[in-house]
Amino acid sequence: MARLKDYYQKKLVAKLKTELGLDNIMEVPAIKKITLNMGVGDAAKDKKIMTFALNDLTAIAGQKPVVTKSKKSIAGFKIRDGWPIGAKVTLRGDRMYEFLDRLITIAIPRIRDFRGLSAKSFDGRGNYSLGMREQISFPEIDYDKVDSIRGLDISITTTAKNDDQGRALLKAFGFPFKS
């Protein structure tokens, strides 16, 4: 069992139940899934770029990503309908908790000029999104083999009913929010 999953079930559920004033432990917010997305606009020009992006995302997530394709042709961006323009992966279960553990303990502290996560990135329903400018913050990425610095979007979907419950859940997991 993943370390954070065990920690959530044994300690956080009881703590959050009293902190949020909930009656039933089934009301306690939990993390449903984590979605990682990497947009690769340059893939239209060079197919190798997409391969490098897929390899990076596979190393970070621990599972194979799905290639996202453009929905329609846009002349201004020089892309055609159906061309690969990115990759995404959805993590659930133990892999999700293991990724969350690596994100909180290793990747976020390695971000340059980091001053805390913005508390404004909640969507109104308790879900949180953050963007990372460099994929090299993750220890799985070998710095010498990186062809270019690429960012990625991380969306954390929770069962929280509002932003306050979502913030309390992520803060209990150890997310370093700005004060």
Swiss-Prot record:
Organism domain of life: Bacteria
Pfam families in UniProt: Ribosomal_L5 (PF00281), Ribosomal_L5_C (PF00673)
PROSITE patterns tied to this protein: RIBOSOMAL_L5 (PS00358)
GO CC aspect terms: ribonucleoprotein complex; ribosome
A GO molecular function held by the record: rRNA binding
Subunit structure: Part of the 50S ribosomal subunit; part of the 5S rRNA/L5/L18/L25 subcomplex. Contacts the 5S rRNA and the P site tRNA. Forms a bridge to the 30S subunit in the 70S ribosome.
NCBIfam families the record matches: PRK00010.1
HAMAP family cross-referenced by the UniProt entry: Ribosomal_uL5_B
Protein's job: This is one of the proteins that bind and probably mediate the attachment of the 5S RNA into the large ribosomal subunit, where it forms part of the central protuberance. In the 70S ribosome it contacts protein S13 of the 30S subunit (bridge B1b), connecting the 2 subunits; this bridge is implicated in subunit movement. Contacts the P site tRNA; the 5S rRNA and some of its associated proteins might help stabilize positioning of ribosome-bound tRNAs.
Name of the protein this chain belongs to: Large ribosomal subunit protein uL5
Organism: Francisella tularensis subsp. mediasiatica (strain FSC147)
